[in-house]
């Protein structure tokens, strides 16, 4: 058995049953919520608020949800909830008794939900398979999205994050890793966004924004030159978190082990892990306190990306000039 495989298995919490290779065929994948995340009071509060919201919404239809994990999988409650929220009628069976009919019903419902939320199927954090297989994380992502769309004033606990353990069966055995997923936004960022120089900057003429972007691109490329990397687009090239982590490592003298991040992220979840790690590093160093949602970076939000890079530019550009010329905050 290889040492890397042993290392990976040691990272799996004892409360999570380790699947055997017989249970998980070659190439198969499973994921689990970490026990600590399940016991997190904010995670429990999120489920409670969502259940109360569903039960209140469906009270006239005498439908009661007792467990989001167990009661949502067959599409019955989701069918009634979405029809009520969206004020429309879906042409599906009221009660589906077989697995095939339940999956078909879920497919029709989720297609309508995704269309209403303007989310492409491949970008959605839920699917027919995950909902049908009682994936609590996927179910919560779906319900949070519906709540934000149809009842934005619902008092969801802010900044709910969970640690997810991924298990994959490879040719050398079982491999595991951990990722952090964001379920709800930072409340101060969502409800009371702080006004700073970048809020004002983006109200100015496009050429002003472009000038700031060019200055920061030049700074970034100068620092990444020794790695043989270059950046042309701030909006897109920082979305997966890789260049951001490498830049922070160069500027702050961090050494990041390859086990800590994804060098070639292949999914939004892996990109989110990288960006979350980068923001945590910046906060730990006292470089950044503005409440940025990691998902905004992954979704290529120009203002959020520029705000983060400017915090590095402001510190290290001044240091390089020995305190000479002063770089004013963009406004």
Curated annotation (Swiss-Prot):
Subcellular location field: Cell junction, Focal adhesion; Cell membrane; Cytoplasm, Cytoskeleton
Keywords assigned: Acetylation, Actin-binding, Cell adhesion, Cell junction, Cell membrane, Cytoplasm, Cytoskeleton, Membrane, Repeat
Region Disordered, residue ranges: 18-38
One GO biological process term: actin cytoskeleton organization
InterPro entries: CH_dom, CH_dom_sf, Parvin
Positions of modified residues (N-acetylmethionine): 1
UniProt domain Calponin-homology (CH): residue ranges: 44-151, 210-317
A Pfam family assignment: CH
Residue spans crossing the bilayer: none
One term of GO molecular function: actin binding
Membrane topology: Peripheral membrane protein
GO cellular component: cytoplasm; cytoskeleton; focal adhesion; plasma membrane
Disulphide-bridged cysteine pairs: none
Tissues with expression: Expressed strongly in spleen and testis, moderately in lung and weakly in brain and heart.
Top-level taxon: Eukaryota
Summary of subunit composition and partner proteins: Interacts with ILK; the interaction promotes the establishment of cell polarity required for leukocyte migration. Interacts with ARHGEF6; the guanine nucleotide exchange factor activity of ARHGEF6 is essential for the PARVG-induced enhancement of cell spreading.
Database matches in PANTHER family: GAMMA-PARVIN, PARVIN
Function according to Swiss-Prot or TrEMBL: Plays a role with ILK in promoting the cell adhesion and spreading of leukocytes.
Family: Belongs to the parvin family.
Protein name: Gamma-parvin
Taxonomic placement: Eukaryota, Metazoa, Chordata, Craniata, Vertebrata
Gene from which this protein is expressed: Parvg
């Amino acid at each position: 058995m290889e040492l890397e495989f042993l290392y990976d298995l040691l990272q799996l919490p004892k409360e999570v049953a380790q699947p055997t290779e017989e249970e998980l065929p070659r190439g198969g994948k499973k994921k689990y919520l970490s026990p600590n995340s399940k016991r997190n009071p904010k995670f429990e509060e999120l489920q409670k608020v969502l259940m109360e919201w569903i039960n209140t919404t469906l009270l006239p239809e005498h439908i009661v949800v007792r467990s989001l994990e167990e009661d949502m999988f067959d599409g019955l409650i989701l069918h009634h909830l979405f029809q009520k929220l969206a004020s429309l009628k879906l042409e599906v069976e009221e009660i589906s008794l077989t697995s095939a009919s339940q999956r078909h019903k879920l497919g029709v419902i989720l297609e309508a939900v995704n269309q209403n939320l303007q989310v492409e199927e491949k970008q959605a954090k839920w699917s027919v398979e995950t909902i049908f297989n009682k994936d609590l994380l996927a179910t919560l992502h779906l319900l949070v999205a519906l709540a934000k769309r149809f009842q934005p004033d619902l008092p969801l606990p802010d900044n709910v994050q969970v640690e997810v353990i991924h298990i994959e069966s490879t040719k050398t055995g079982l491999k595991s890793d951990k990722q952090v997923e964001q379920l709800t936004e930072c409340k101060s960022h969502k409800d009371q966004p702080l006004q700073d120089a970048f809020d004002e900057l983006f109200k100015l003429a496009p050429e002003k924004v472009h000038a700031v972007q060019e200055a920061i691109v030049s700074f970034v490329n100068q620092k990444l030159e020794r790695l043989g990397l270059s950046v042309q687009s701030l909006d897109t090239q920082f979305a997966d978190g890789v260049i951001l982590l490498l830049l922070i490592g160069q500027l702050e003298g961090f050494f990041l082990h390859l086990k800590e991040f994804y060098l070639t992220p292949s999914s939004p979840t892996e990109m989110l892990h990288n960006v979350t790690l980068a923001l945590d590093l910046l906060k730990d160093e006292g470089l950044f306190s503005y409440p940025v949602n990691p998902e905004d970076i992954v979704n290529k939000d120009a203002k959020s990306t520029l705000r983060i890079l400017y915090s590095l530019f402001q510190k290290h550009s001044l240091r390089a000039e020995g305190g000479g010329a002063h770089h004013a905050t963009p406004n």
